[in-house]
Amino acid sequence: MLKFQGSTHFRQRIICSTLSGKAIRITNIRDEDEKPGLRDYEASFLRLVDKITNGSKIEINSTGTQITYIPGIIIGGKGITHECGTVRGIGYFVEALICLGPFAKAPLDITLNGITNNDIDLTIDTIRTTTLPIIRKFGIEEGLIIKIIKRGAPPNGGGSVNFKCPIVPHLKAIQLIDEGKIRRIRGIAYATRISPQFSNRVLDKAKGLLLEYTPDVYISSDHYKGNESGLSPGYGLTLVAETTTGCCLSAECMSNTGIATTEQQLQKQKSTSETPEDLGERTAFALLEEIFNGGCIDSHNQSLALLFMVLCPEDISKVRLGKITPYTIEFIRQLRDFFGVTFKIEPDQNSKTVLFTCLGIGYKNMARSTF
C-alpha cells in the first residue's frame, strides 16, 4: 500500500491507483484547516469512481482527514448519471473519465450535470477541440464523443454533458516531435442567459488581435437561451490554434461570476468587472503565450499525454512539450511511484521546448470480456 500526506493532487493519486491496481492511504487531509477533511467535490469524485468500478473499497475516517482506497475493476457502463455539484466544473470529472474509460469492461456512456465552463477547470469546449484529438492519436478513435446538452455557468451551474468513451485492448505508441507552424485559429464565443451582444464583443476583440498574426481566424458565436442555458448568466471564449502537423494548442477564459446582465449595469460595474473586450484580449494573449511556449501539446493536456505514454505497449514514445507546469512535474512523480517509470528529458535550447521519451509498460485492458 502506497502512503501519501495532504490534499494536493488527490485526483492524480486516485486515477493512478485505479489504473495500477495499487491501494493507497492518504492522511493529514487539510488537518490544520478550519474545515478539515475532504471537500464536497472530492467526495463527489470518489462517488463517480465508485460508479464506474466494481469491487472498489473506500474508507474515510470520521473527520475526513484520512482515506484508504483499494481499487477494483473498471466496468464502465451505460445510462450512468452523476451530479458534479457547483464547486468544480464538469471538466474536472471528465478528465478522470478520459484516463479510466478506455480500460473499462464495457464502453462508457455517462451524463454529468453541473458547471460546463469556469476559470478553474478545463471547459468542455477545450476537451472537445483539444483533449480528444490527442487521445485519438493513441488509438482511441471510434465512439469517443462529448456533447454539451445544456451550458451551465457559475455559480449555479445547471449544465449537462454527455460523454461516450469506447474501450481498447491497448494503446498505440506515439511520436509527437514536430510541432509545425500555425495553420489556422478557430474558436467559440458563448453566452448563456445573457444578450448575444456580449459574446459578439468578445469575438470581435479577440479576432482583431489574432488577425495581426495570421489571416485564417474564424470564431463562431454560440448563444444559449431558455432550457439549454443553465441557471446562471455568463459568457466566455475558447480558442484553438491548429498547426501544419496536426497539433492543437488551446486557451480559454470565462467571465467573472455576478456579471452585469444589461449594458447599463455593465457601465456601473466597469471598475470592478471585466468588460467583454478585456476578456477577448486576455484569451487572445493566453493563446499567443501557449504558441510562444511551443510544444506539440498545450499546458492543459501535458499530464494526460505523459500518462498514456506510460501505458503504451513496450515501445518508445516521444513527445515535445513547451513550458512544463508544476502540475505536470508532480504528476511525473506520481507516475514513478505507481508505475515505476521515469522519463528521459532533453531540453532543446533552440526551440525552448523539452523532449520527453519513455518506454511503455505494455498496459493491457484486462477488464474487457473479449474483442
Curated annotation (Swiss-Prot):
UniProt xrefs under InterPro entries: RNA3'-term_phos_cycl_insert, RNA3'_phos_cyclase_dom, RNA3'_phos_cyclase_dom_sf, RNA3'_term_phos_cyc, RNA3'_term_phos_cyc_type_2, RNA3'_term_phos_cycl-like_CS, RNA3'P_cycl/enolpyr_Trfase_a/b, RPTC_insert
Highest taxon listed in the record's lineage: Eukaryota
Pfam families named among the record's database cross-references: RTC, RTC_insert
Chief place of localization: nucleus
One GO molecular-function entry: RNA endonuclease activity
Location in the cell: Nucleus, Nucleolus
Keyword tags: Nucleus, Ribosome biogenesis
Record bears the keyword Nucleus: yes
GO biological process, alphabetically ordered: endonucleolytic cleavage of tricistronic rRNA transcript (SSU-rRNA, 5.8S rRNA, LSU-rRNA); ribosomal small subunit biogenesis
Assigned GO CC terms: nucleolus; phagocytic vesicle; small-subunit processome
Function: Part of the small subunit (SSU) processome, first precursor of the small eukaryotic ribosomal subunit. During the assembly of the SSU processome in the nucleolus, many ribosome biogenesis factors, an RNA chaperone and ribosomal proteins associate with the nascent pre-rRNA and work in concert to generate RNA folding, modifications, rearrangements and cleavage as well as targeted degradation of pre-ribosomal RNA by the RNA exosome. Does not have cyclase activity.
Assigned protein family: Belongs to the RNA 3'-terminal cyclase family. Type 2 subfamily.
Subunit note: Part of the small subunit (SSU) processome, composed of more than 70 proteins and the RNA chaperone small nucleolar RNA (snoRNA) U3.
The protein's name in its UniProt record: Probable RNA 3'-terminal phosphate cyclase-like protein
Source organism of the structure: Dictyostelium discoideum
Lineage start: Eukaryota, Amoebozoa, Evosea, Eumycetozoa, Dictyostelia
